[in-house]
Curated annotation (Swiss-Prot):
It holds the Pfam family HHH_5. Belongs to the RuvA family. Disulfide bonds: none annotated. Residues 154-199 are annotated as: Domain III. The gene is ruvA. GO terms for molecular function: ATP binding; four-way junction DNA binding; four-way junction helicase activity. InterPro entries: DNA_helicase_Holl-junc_RuvA_I (IPR013849), Hlx-hairpin-Hlx_DNA-bd_motif (IPR003583), NA-bd_OB-fold (IPR012340), RuvA (IPR000085), RuvA_2-like (IPR010994), RuvA_C (IPR011114), RuvA_C_sf (IPR036267). Homotetramer. Forms an RuvA(8)-RuvB(12)-Holliday junction (HJ) complex. HJ DNA is sandwiched between 2 RuvA tetramers; dsDNA enters through RuvA and exits via RuvB. An RuvB hexamer assembles on each DNA strand where it exits the tetramer. Each RuvB hexamer is contacted by two RuvA subunits (via domain III) on 2 adjacent RuvB subunits; this complex drives branch migration. In the full resolvosome a probable DNA-RuvA(4)-RuvB(12)-RuvC(2) complex forms which resolves the HJ. HAMAP family: DNA_HJ_migration_RuvA. This is Holliday junction branch migration complex subunit RuvA. Has three domains with a flexible linker between the domains II and III and assumes an 'L' shape. Domain III is highly mobile and contacts RuvB. It is found in: Cytoplasm. Residues 144-154 are annotated as: Flexible linker.
Amino acid sequence: MIGRISGLLLEKNPPQILVDAHGVGYELEVPMSTFYGLPATGTQVSLHTHLAIREDGHFLYGFATDEERTAFRQLLKVSGIGARTALAVLSGLSVSDLAQAVALQEAGRLVKIPGIGKKTAERLLLELRDKLGKALPQVAGARLAAVAGGAPDAKSDILNALLALGYNEKEALGAMKGLAEDTGVSDGIRQALKLLSKA
């Protein structure tokens, strides 16, 4: 498995790029979120990668952050979602926006992405609901905390956020036991996710 590539950025032809790593030129497909952050050609670049081996060839995908790659891998686990669609999703939404859309079940945000219809969006939300929050707890928790930050009942918001991330009520309440009464939503979600990730 090729997990990371560092080398000279030779070509940029969205969504493909060519990276020279020690004399070997690697073709990678990247989401537009990564593409727009790339340096100029002729300079060094380092990307997290995912290698897909299929009957019709080997395909390498590059990502600016490990969170993007993790989200890509979770998207590939959704039935009927291939690499092209997964790249389209990450090109249309940041990882934190995707985490929020999944947690709050916002199909409307997904159908705005080219190639994503209503049924596909609903399937994505359903199948990712129990996976994305656990795969990316810090991103999802921080995003939900930002959304719920102004709500008056912090404990209720923390519980709802954890349930939206795919944890059951018993797990969520167990993680909330040690929280102080005056804990804010943002800190509460962060502390609870920390405990749940160790469980």
